[in-house]
């Protein structure tokens, strides 16, 4: 009895210590990268305009227009992308469903051969395939997972993807505009807040990539800062030329 309890305790400890990150990033990845995209693009846009020595009102309007246009563009693109992917998956599932209905024996043999190729004994592979093929819906799910790498019960929603992308982009793009909306009369507070936001986004990305937070933060700060520097230089150049 003591041995069984000890083995159970060791198994429980192993399970607690043997956890893996979600390599797909879950909701965090698209949210962080959407916000980062909004922050970098709107910061670069506003910095470029500021480099042209325009009025404060022009910079604010540019930032708000960039936020709105970018967020809607991201949402539309994400909706189209996810909807197209979902339609493709549904089409593949329809093909598999039709094959299971018309040629059940062939599909069962296919599944058995798949398990055999993974090292399962032939007799056991055939028995497992036979048992799994008794329920048509279960058979469809198994074939989708094993042959197509698809989870029929976990298809992404285009609407959720679009709304998430819109919100994340808008949130990131709002950072360089926010100081102006709160009464700032120069571009420096907006730039400072945006740079802090860049470092913060990079630090959060470290949760997905498993890199050190300071390295990820500094890398994103450097990339965003470089984009802002280039657009500022271009804005200054063209502003001087036009002026």
Place the predicted regions along the sequence by residue.
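Cytosol/matrix-facing amphipathic helices and coiled-coil assembly/linker segments
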Residues: 2-30, 82-165
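Internal alpha-helical transmembrane segments
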Residues: 2-81
